[in-house]
Every structure is written in C-alpha cells, then in structure tokens.
Amino acid sequence: MIKNLLAEAQAYNGLEAIQSLIEDGQTLSAIPMQPLYVASRALDASNMSALLPRLTPEQRNVFLDIDLWKKDDLDPDRFDYWLEAYHQCEVDEVKQEFINSSEFYLFLKAIFNVWTFDVEDPNYPNHDYYFLTDDSLLLFEYSEDYEQVLEAKALIRELYAQKGVEHAYAYLFKLVSDSYSSLEEIEYKEKKERLRDYGFVDYYEALELSLIHI
C-alpha cells in the first residue's frame, strides 16, 4: 500500500506546499489524506510528536492504519516509531487517545507476555526482562532484544493515571487471556473498513483487482 501511496502522492502538485505547511506549523485539517501522509513520512519520531496535535483524530488514526500493517499482519517493528512519537507528545489528550486505542492494546499483546502477579507469593521469570505495573498486580515479560521498554512502561503508567488503578488493571488483565490472532483479525477488518472510507484499497483487495484485469 505504501508504495502505491508514494507513487500517487509524487504526482500531487502540492506535495512541496504540504511539506511547507508542516514545517511552518499551519493547520493541516483540510489537506487530502494521501499526500499529507506521504509528506510526513520523512519526519523522525521527535518531529512527528510535535505534528500529532495538529492532526485531526481521523488523520492520526489513518496514519496508524496505513503504517502499522504488512498485508494483514501487524508490524510490531514499525510500531516502535509511533510508540516513541506518542511517548514524546506533550498534549495529554492526544497521548490518551493513543493509549486507549485498539492498536496500542494489540501492540502490548504482540510484544509482551502478561501475567498476573501476587506479591505475597511472587513468581518471577528466571531472567531480568520484565517489569511490574505500579500496582504490582501484573507482570510484563519481554524479549531481551526489545529496546522500547521505557517508552511502553511510561505509556502504561499514563494509562493507569488516566483510568485509575482499578479500571486500568481490569483493562490490561484481559491481555492475559485474549487471543492475539483473534484480536489481530478483528483489528485488520476494522482498519480495512476505515481506510476504504478514505478511498484506500488494502493489499488483498488490490491483488483481487489486478487479477481481474489479467
């Protein structure tokens, strides 16, 4: 999908103008989605964090829908970029939108093994690659080569601050038993419908269309 977007957007006469709008801090709400996304792809996570509050919720959501998937699979590696961008974002409303999103929940399920934890009868992994939530009721275990632990932990802490301990625990507790494959399938179908509303065609739909014309 991204390759197609790049090709289409390069033909858009206002691409350089959009990049100027991004750099100048002007409003972006009326800019067509495809060229806006392409113009923003050159930004590092720090600059994207400053851009996020200037986007509409719909624009932010479409950016994630486009960027986080390889065909019908979530791409956890690409998620690291957005994790850093939202972690650095200074607008609480935007950050809270992200940590309450289904994408963030699915990301946590993809990266972490989540276990209940009993402080009176603690059961720790036999390695150091884990952390406890601030209420010490959940243990998040991760692979030794995962590098975005501090950012993920900080956003989980934000979730607790927003929802309160009881509701945050109840929300994250579902990670213990939820099926990743089922969650991913549901999210893929929902993101496909959202993108279709903006005129985007996903990989498999594009493949079907190309086969029809062979």
Q: What is the role of each PLM region?
A:
Residues 103-201:
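Extended alpha-helical scaffolding regions
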Residues 2-50, 54-109, 115-116, 132:
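Alpha-helical scaffold segments
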Residues 212-214:
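Conserved small/polar residues in nucleotide/adenosyl-binding loops
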